[in-house]
């Protein structure tokens, strides 16, 4: 199965099953999970990047533990709508995950400003220290990304 656009992704999903959202960074991958009705996204975990095979194994274990059947990967588009180097890296992640699980539904979601928005909320509304923000911002950004995709899926 190729990486899908959001409409084909919706068609590939069973009626009730969780989906995970990923916010891949240079050193970590933020992971969020939806409920089985795909209404609410919640931050789940932070995977410290090591080797792709180990990272993928950890991701698949998280997915299995939550009954997740598909992945939404954040795509950090430039403000003008073009794709930069990080987009290429995230697209490669999607392709590599499909090599391990060819039938896994995967789509991308524009994550522009997700990390900045989450950081602003953590500072303005929760007064969280920089150290604590660094620990939670990626998985919260994954939740932000996944929630955006879930809202789009509900509109289809």
Curated annotation (Swiss-Prot):
Family of the protein in this entry: Belongs to the YqgF nuclease family.
Assigned EC number: 3.1.-.-
Compartments in which it is found: Cytoplasm
Protein name (record): Putative pre-16S rRNA nuclease
SUPFAM superfamilies: Ribonuclease H-like
One GO term of the biological process aspect: rRNA 5'-end processing
Gene Ontology terms, MF aspect: nuclease activity
Name of the top EC class for this enzyme: hydrolase
């Amino acid at each position: 199965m190729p990486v899908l656009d959001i409409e084909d992704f919706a068609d590939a999903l069973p009626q009730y099953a969780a989906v995970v959202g990923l916010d891949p960074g240079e050193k970590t991958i933020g992971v969020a999970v939806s409920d089985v009705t795909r209404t609410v996204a919640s931050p789940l975990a932070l995977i410290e990047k090591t080797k792709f095979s180990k990272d993928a194994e950890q991701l698949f274990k998280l997915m299995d533990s939550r009954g997740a059947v598909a992945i939404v990967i954040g795509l950090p588009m430039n403000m003008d709508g073009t794709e930069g180097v990080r987009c290429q890296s995230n697209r490669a992640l999607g392709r590599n995950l499909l090599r391990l699980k060819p039938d896994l539904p995967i789509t991308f979601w524009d994550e522009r400003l997700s990390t900045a928005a989450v950081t602003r909320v953590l500072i303005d509304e929760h007064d969280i220290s920089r150290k604590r923000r660094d620990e939670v911002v990626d998985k919260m950004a994954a939740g932000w990304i996944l929630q955006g995709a879930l809202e789009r899926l509900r509109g289809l």
